[in-house]
Amino acid sequence: MSEPLKPRIDFEQPLQSLDEPVLKSAQAFDEQAAEKFYPAAPELDAEDEEGRVEGLVNAALKPKRSLWRKMVTAGMVILGASVIAQSVQWVNQAWQQQDWIALGATTAGGLIILAGVGSVVTEWRRLYHLRQRAEERDIARALLVSHGVGQGRVFCEKLARQAGLDQGHPALQRWQASLHETHNDREVVELYAKLVQPALDNQARAEISRYAAESALMIAVSPLALVDMAFIAWRNIRLINRIAALYGIELGYFSRIRLFRLVLLNIAFAGASELVREVGMDWLSQDLAARLSARAAQGIGAGLLTARLGIKAMELCRPLPWLEGDKPKLGDFRRQLMNQLKNTLPKKDKTAH
């Protein structure tokens, strides 16, 4: 038996129709736009953060243009021209009057002024090379995303000359043998970063390990805090000078102060989060105090500070940005320091007993 029909249902509001998706118009990419296109990678977020820090450091490197600076420069130029004109007049008068004492004093003063001007020019040139290294990293960063051809090889050969690598260097020969005419600028720079640049980076890493170990051992065995502070400061400055020399940067007085200040500035911008990320949580999971003395723990801290200064000095002196997996980590230096201290301190204890 069939079921009775249901009554009709009247809806007060009309049924809502589904919204059709709005499609964007087609967009065609030409060859010029395709060369500038590169896919986005989420793993590059950390590198973007470091790039912002690098931008802040580069801004600190570049001199600030201001009206007062221009006025002071113009005043110094006018004063220098006046001193030169007055010196010429004094020399002329002393020569005519045969005043040999005044002539000798004027000549000596002129030589001192020339020596001072030469020192200023030399310091400016060294500061310029330090600023130029930051510009070279920007150029390298642009070439690493470029699909062009021709500029990468010229740029890398310039870096090799600045580093003092001759044509017979094994790393440079391997790089030249690996090049092919089909390689673009990005591939050429990547090959240079993987084959040639490690020859300098390994030397810098060895210097950092040696200086960090010396600082850690000095703090661990020395009972005088003032001597420790002076020793650490002296060794850190020596380390920065050594790393700069390895990468072909000649430091003067002001450029050395500028580089040391930029290293500290870079560390301040990086913050403590990078230290925790690189060292890891094994500081909390392992009972360090049970295995090493308090002085040894202080030595490890001083050694890590030296290693951190060295790593930041490498970043500022390298002509190329870090590629993935190339940047040295504090955890590697920490393990080396702990092994050296564990092998050294027990020997000292045995000899004392």
Swiss-Prot record:
InterPro entries: DUF697, UPF0283. Keywords: Cell inner membrane, Cell membrane, Membrane, Transmembrane, Transmembrane helix. The chain crosses the membrane at residues 71-91, 101-121, 214-234. It is a multi-pass membrane protein. The keyword Transferase does not apply. It is found in: Cell inner membrane. Pfam families: DUF697. Its main location: membrane. Coiled coil: none annotated. HAMAP family: UPF0283. Belongs to the UPF0283 family. This is UPF0283 membrane protein YPO2347/y1985/YP_2134.
